[in-house]
Regions:
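A short glycine-rich, Lys/Arg-flanked "PGG" loop and its adjoining helix->strand segment in the class I
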Residues: 97-98, 164-179
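Class I SAM-dependent methyltransferase SAM/SAH-binding core
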Residues: 83-141
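Class I SAM-dependent transferase core
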Residues: 25-83
Length: 251
């Protein structure tokens, strides 16, 4: 009986191992996912369709004092290097360039060719000499390593369909002591928002630590800032967050 039990246990372990290997192979062969994301776990949450390039009219946002509140919370100072991810038409890019001044730099990133083109024209028209523009991909913002004091993601993180790959590629771009700033809305991910608990879980899975969280009406949502707190995990070691339609997040 004992020998039979050992045989069954060994067989069960072998089957489990084969299942893991098969799952890895399936992930690598899943052509519906970007090649650069296939080594990472898939997020178990719905994602909103990419919204328009203008979250709201710029004067309306200025009347609420949105950008000033966000930049104050993020402690954006002259001389800093800041990345504006999902820059769109450049609402934050323009205001960040004023805040960091001529000795600072702003890198504006987007994945939409039309937005990139329009933003390029705006930068040229307004002679924003301390702004650079790059085109990223949905799973990788393509930021240079060790370059930024702040990485800003305003009302766009909920549109990231490969969060584990995205944050893994993003993380090395921070300078020591740098922060990733997220401004978003507390609602399900398929309704153009992300619950804070799920946000914390996804960032935690990549070795980030929450350092500030504020909810303000001027933001039409909440502000969250993260710092690197541990080693960057290997893609295969990342533990995906369990979710219920993007409403919760626990590892």
């Amino acid at each position: 009986m004992t020998g039979q039990f050992k045989f069954r246990t060994t067989a069960g372990l072998m089957l489990a191992a084969l299942a893991v290997v098969s799952a890895c192979k399936l992930s690598r062969s899943d052509t519906s996912r970007p090649e650069a994301a296939r080594d990472f776990p898939q997020a178990f949450r719905p994602v909103s369709a990419v919204g328009g390039t203008e979250f709201a009219a710029e004067d309306q946002r200025d009347n609420l004092g949105e950008a000033q509140v966000v930049m104050d919370l993020a402690a954006i100072k002259p001389g800093m290097r800041v990345a504006d991810i999902g820059a769109g038409e450049g609402y934050y890019t323009v205001r960040l360039t004023e805040r960091v001044g001529p000795k600072g730099r702003v890198l504006a990133e987007d994945i939409d060719p039309v937005s990139i083109q329009n933003l390029g024209r705006r930068v040229e028209r307004e002679r924003l000499d301390n702004v650079s523009i790059i085109t990223g991909t949905p799973e990788d913002a393509k930021l240079p390593a060790d370059s930024f004091d702040r990485i800003m993601m305003v009302h766009m993180y909920h549109e990231v369909s490969e969060p584990y790959a995205f944050l893994w590629y993003l993380r090395p771009a921070l300078k020591p002591g740098g922060q990733v700033v997220v401004v978003d809305v507390d609602r399900p991910t398929d309704q153009h928002g992300i619950p804070p608990r799920l946000l914390f879980c996804e960032f935690g899975a990549l070795g980030f630590r929450l350092v500030q969280f504020v909810s303000k009406p001027e933001l039409n949502g909440y502000y969250a800032a993260f710092e690197v707190a541990g080693a960057r995990p290997a893609p295969k070691d990342i533990k995906p967050c369990n979710t219920a339609s993007g409403k919760t997040g626990t590892q």
